[in-house]
Amino acid sequence: EVVMAPKELAAYFGTPEKPECHMLYNVSTMVNLWGALASRDTRLLKAQLDALHALPDNCWFVNYLRCHDDIGWGLDEAVENRLGIDPQKHKEYLYHFYEGNFPGSWAKGELYNYDPATGDARSCGTTASLCGVEHALEKGDKTALDYAVKRDLLLHTAMAFLQGFPMLNCGDEIAQL
């Protein structure tokens, strides 16, 4: 598992003549998929996918939506700045949104490792909970549940069509809360 910008990942794969790592977890795409879903803005995701597609052919990834780890909001701050997005405010929006502590949020995740001095935090939760299934079930809202399932399916469909190998994890196959 390597958590860094796509341009820095190629070295871990080696070369076709001297291969090293065969596959890496696709942490940055996971983070950018969740970011795009909450912000309803795909520009960061597109920039990150463009960077991945520019890597050599020997670079393969395991694509996933959730795993046993928290979501560290390690977005590409240079790209955010170029797009006119304040990196710190965006990160704070994302972790509050997925905590369910933002107006209009459907998510029911948990804040993890919050540091008031830096404003940094991470998010925890299953795919189903972050997509709104848990929140909709608690409210008995069938329309919200329908949207939550559609968000879950959207993310899984996107993941399945990314270059690399899709991985279901943490009860995704049964929408575990």
Model regions and ranges:
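Active-site and adjacent substrate-binding regions of carbohydrate-active enzymes
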Residues: 1-177
